[in-house]
Structure formats: structure tokens, C-alpha cells
A protein has these predicted regions:
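Bacterial Sec-dependent N-terminal signal peptides
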Residues: 1-29, 39, 427, 442-443
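Bacterial Sec-pathway N-terminal export signals of envelope proteins
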Residues: 19-68, 72, 78, 228, ...
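Small/polar, glycine/serine/threonine/aspartate-rich low-complexity segments that form flexible
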Residues: 21-24, 70-111, 237-245, 291-324
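Periplasmic alpha-helical coiled-coil/stalk elements that build and connect Gram-negative outer-membrane
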Residues: 30, 54, 142-257, 371
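Sec/SRP-type N-terminal targeting helices
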Residues: 43-47, 60-61, 113-140, 190, ...
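Short segments within alpha-helical structural elements
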Residues: 61, 204-226, 382-440
């Protein structure tokens, strides 16, 4: 029995240790760092870079020597017959030339000497790599913003639950006291019913937010690249994060559109279209290739090719091929015209992107400044609403205020509390959006 108890205690002990190991305690900065290493989007983007690097090498190898080997074997089940008048008697005599079996082996090296499309293709492959790298940079920025928003949503949920629990506790006390006063005949039944309605509404809100809590944690795990049911504990508070994310200097920071990742991506898109036009133009240039072949052939009436005394006859060949496009029925000209139109469109998109990013920077600065002002106002308003509600509660129990006045004060308090919580989230989220709009790199 003692052994069984010992085993149970040991099992519980190690299970507790395992559970602790599986629980992550993370500040917002740590959550971002973790996500940039483990999120699904970042990992996929890094794979895209590796893919692009392999694509560059694949394109490069087109211009490098290409060596192929060939081995052939023939066995004439019935050899072809040739007719010839060898004895000049006027009659063709049948003859069989050659051996019944033969085998040949060869090695051929092909080398591209000049191809305009190869040069353009090599440039395009490098541009493709740059696009993949820029896409990864954008993914990193999006991941950072997603983690900030998800982390903030968890804190909002936690704070909302705490506020609702506090409100329910106070309201429950008021409801109980009002019910006792009603039993003693000092107030109306409507006062009790009014508080009961408010209490029921608060409990429903608490139940709803409590259910949303697990979803908020799962969304944070997903943004970080965790299994969605991973246990995590957030070490930052909503209030501390809000204060840390108030930076008026950020609002006055200059915006350089040429440094923005979206502008760079748009520039690369234009470069891609330019290379496509050059590719179509290069198809009108000649293509020059060279080849070198070494071979050996053996002949026999029986399969003796693996014998040491089998005679093999060597051969070698060096050659050059020149291919010159002459006439394509104006199909090439049509393709060049299409590529030119695509390049013109890319120029327009580049100008549009520049204007859009400049406007976006101004808008996000304004949104961020407004969110700071709303936060400061909401913080002041929630304190005022608490004082008003407290005064109305005292007046209500002293019999000099109605339940309607108390209800108004309570609803005003609850609204201001939620406004305050949401204003803190807005500061955090809008700062992340502004940093992305200004293309401030992740630290």
C-alpha cells in the first residue's frame, strides 16, 4: 500500500513538473521574439527564400556545361540484306553487311555560348530572390502586429472579466440590501427588480467574455506559432503596456516612402515587368551553342562486349550550332508590345503606391494621436463615473434618489469602464499600425 501511495505521489509530482514546463510565461516583447522564430507565416516565408535561392542556382546552371552519357545496344534478329552484282553476271546477289550485334557508348558536353534570354533570366531569378526576401520582411512586420493585437485582446478580456466581477460583487451587495429594505417596506418593488435586471445583464456579459477568453488565448497561440491549446501566462499588464506605447515623438517622425517595404515591393514588381520586356526583346537575338562528343563502338556476331579482348573503336566530334530567328509573323512584336504595356501599368502602380503610403502614414499618425487623447479622456471619465455612481448609490440607500438615477449612474460607469479598456487597446494597436506604416523595423 505504501508503494502504491509513493507511486501516485511521484506520478503527480512529475505531472506537475511537466505541466509547468508546458506553460509559457511571456511579456509582449518575448511573445514577439518567439513568434518571429516560430510562427507559421515566418517559417513559410523563410522557405520561400530558400526556394528562390535554389531557383537562382537552377537558372545559373543553364549557362554552365551540361554533360550527358548514352549507352546503346542493338541485336539484329534478322539482318537486312543488300543486293549487288558483284560478279557482273547481270544478276543481283544478296549480301549481309556488318555484324549481328553492336554496342556504342558516348559522352556529350553541351555549352551555351550566347543566349540573350539566359542573361535576362538570370537577372529575373535574382529579382525573384529579392522579392522573396522583401515578402519575408513584410511577413515579419505583419506577424509582429498580429501578436501585439492578439496579446492586447487577451489582456482586454482579462481586464473586462475583472471589472465585471467587481461590478457584479458590488451590485449583488446592493441587490441584497435593497431586497431587505423592500421587505421592511422602505422602498418599492421596482427598485429591486431594476437591480435584478442590471445584475442579470452583467452576469450574461461575464459569461460571454469568459467564453471568449479561451478563444483569445488560442488566437494568440496561433499568431505565435504554438499549438492553440498551449498554456501561456502573460506577464505584462494592459495599463503598463499602454503607458509604454505612448510615444509622441513617433507622431513627428519623418516618413521616407523609399524605405517602406511596400514601395520596395512595388519597385521590384516594376523591375520584373521591365525584365519581361527585355526577355521578349532578347528572343529576337541569335543563340549560339557548342558541343563536344566522345564515343566508342564495338561490333560482334555474339555478345562479347564485356570480354577483355573485344575491340572498341573510338570517335570524337566537336561542333557549333547557331540559331537565328528570322520571321515570327509579328508574334514577337505583339509580345514585346504587351510587355511594354505591363511595364507602363507597373509605373502607374508605383506612383499610386507612393501616394497611398504617404496618405497611410498621415492617417495612422492621426489615428494614433486620437487614441492617446481618447485614452487620457477615458481614464479621467472612468474616475468621474465611479464617483458619480458612488454618490448615487449613497443617495439611493438614503432614500433621496430613485432607482432610475442609480441605474443611469451604473450604466454610465459600465460604459466608461469598457471605453477605458478599449482605449488602452487602441493605443497599443494603433502604435503597432503606425510603426508598420512608417516601416520601423522590429527590434
Amino acid at each position: 500500500m505504501k508503494k502504491l501511495i509513493l507511486v501516485c505521489i511521484s506520478t503527480c509530482f512529475f505531472a506537475t513538473i511537466y505541466a509547468q514546463e508546458k506553460t509559457q510565461q511571456l511579456s509582449l516583447k518575448e511573445a514577439i521574439t518567439y513568434a518571429l522564430k516560430n510562427s507559421y507565416g515566418v517559417k513559410a516565408a523563410q522557405n520561400d527564400i530558400l526556394l528562390a535561392q535554389k531557383k537562382v542556382w537552377e537558372t545559373t546552371t543553364i549557362g554552365l556545361p551540361q554533360i550527358t552519357g548514352a549507352l546503346g545496344y542493338q541485336n539484329f534478329l534478322q539482318q537486312p540484306v543488300t543486293l549487288a552484282d558483284f560478279d557482273q553476271d547481270g544478276t543481283d546477289d544478296p549480301f549481309v553487311f556488318g555484324t549481328k550485334q553492336n554496342m556504342n557508348a558516348s559522352v556529350t558536353m553541351n555549352q551555351l555560348l550566347f543566349d540573350g534570354s539566359y542573361i535576362v533570366g538570370l537577372q529575373a531569378a535574382k529579382t525573384y530572390l529579392k522579392i522573396s526576401e522583401q515578402a519575408t520582411e513584410k511577413t515579419v512586420m505583419r506577424t509582429k502586429e498580429a501578436v501585439i493585437n492578439a496579446y492586447g485582446n487577451v489582456l482586454v478580456t482579462e481586464n473586462s472579466i475583472l471589472v465585471l466581477e467587481g461590478n457584479i460583487e458590488v451590485l449583488q451587495q446592493n441587490y441584497t440590501a435593497t431586497k431587505e429594505i423592500y421587505k421592511n417596506g422602505f422602498n418599492e418593488e421596482e427598485d429591486v427588480e431594476q437591480l435584478e435586471i442590471t445584475l442579470g445583464n452583467l452576469k450574461n456579459q461575464l459569461n460571454s467574455i469568459s467564453r471568449m477568453k479561451s478563444i483569445a488565448y488560442q488566437m494568440l497561440n496561433l499568431a505565435m506559432g504554438n499549438e492553440i491549446d498551449t498554456k501561456i501566462i502573460l506577464t505584462d499588464t494592459l495599463d503598463s503596456l499602454t503607458k509604454a506605447n505612448i510615444s509622441l515623438a513617433l507622431i513627428s517622425q519623418d516618413f521616407k516612402v523609399s524605405n517602406h517595404i511596400d514601395f520596395k515591393i512595388s519597385e521590384n514588381d516594376r523591375e520584373t515587368k521591365r525584365l519581361m520586356m527585355r526577355l521578349e526583346q532578347s528572343k529576337g537575338l541569335p543563340t549560339l551553342t557548342a558541343f563536344l562528343n566522345f564515343g566508342a563502338q564495338a561490333n560482334s556476331d555474339s555478345f562479347t562486349f564485356l570480354n577483355g579482348n573485344q575491340r572498341w573503336y573510338d570517335s570524337s566530334l566537336l561542333g557549333v550550332n547557331l540559331s537565328i530567328p528570322i520571321f515570327t509573323s509579328f508574334g514577337g512584336a505583339a509580345k514585346i508590345a504587351q510587355a511594354k504595356i505591363a511595364l507602363d501599368t507597373a509605373d502607374l502602380r508605383l506612383i499610386e503606391t507612393k501616394q497611398r503610403l504617404s496618405l497611410q502614414a498621415q492617417k495612422t499618425k492621426n489615428d494614433y494621436q486620437v487614441s492617446i487623447e481618447n485614452y487620457q479622456t477615458s481614464k479621467k471619465n472612468v474616475h468621474l463615473a465611479e464617483r458619480i455612481e458612488k454618490k448615487q448609490r449613497v443617495k439611493f440607500f438614503e432614500g433621496i434618489s430613485s432607482s432610475f438615477d442609480l441605474l443611469q449612474a451604473q450604466n454610465q460607469l459600465y460604459t466608461q469602464q469598457q471605453n477605458y479598456i478599449q482605449s488602452m487597446l487602441a493605443v497599443i494597436a494603433n502604435k503597432a499600425t503606425l510603426e508598420n506604416a512608417l516601416n520601423i523595423p522590429t527590434k
